[in-house]
Amino acid sequence: MGLELLFQGSNIERLLNGLWVTAEIAFVSVFFACILGVIFGVIMTNRNPIIKAICRFYLEFVRIIPLLALLFLAYFGLAKWFDIHLDGISVCILVFIFWGTAEMGDLVRGALTSIEKHQVESAYALGLTPFQTFVYISLPQSLKRVTPSAINLFTRMVKTSSLAMLIGVVEVIKVGQQIIEHSLFSNQSAALWIYGVIFGLYFVICYPLSLFSRYLETRWES
């Protein structure tokens, strides 16, 4: 049985350690991308043409360049051009924050601009300052509207963390490949069982995010 492969040696421990690396990359990236993305989204609503052009260039750059290319560029480019030597995990976190901030910022921008103008005008008529209007009216509604898309982005970041293996990070899929390669000749169904377990591990991480998103939507609607 291929299931026995999981209990040979320290295979389960290795997979769990790989999952921890995956979770570390994903959740640290999500945390900072969320904070910076909200700030970036607010900046994107600025009417200054220069600021808008810079923000648009950053967003389009992130969307046009494949994430894998950004990983390679950061991992090898920083060392060669700037003599900055970072480990693979740090590079992944920085690149994912760079990517996630742009995507989250665009979501926040869209949510902010979707607020009806009459609400803002009414707030001004009642004597609220622009800052008070933003904090008490625009921001709370925007965060509610952006939550489903933001959770979807966070789930994508978790799944995309598997690209880390391509720059030498021993995350859960890399560990799975190592186990499969070591056992392929002795166990023909090794890949099926190992990747099945990895699927389950990703599900354990991603499904609670989906449930949390539904919970927030239900609570805010009520």
Task: Give the location of each predicted region.
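Transmembrane alpha-helices and adjacent helix-loop boundaries
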Residues: 1-222
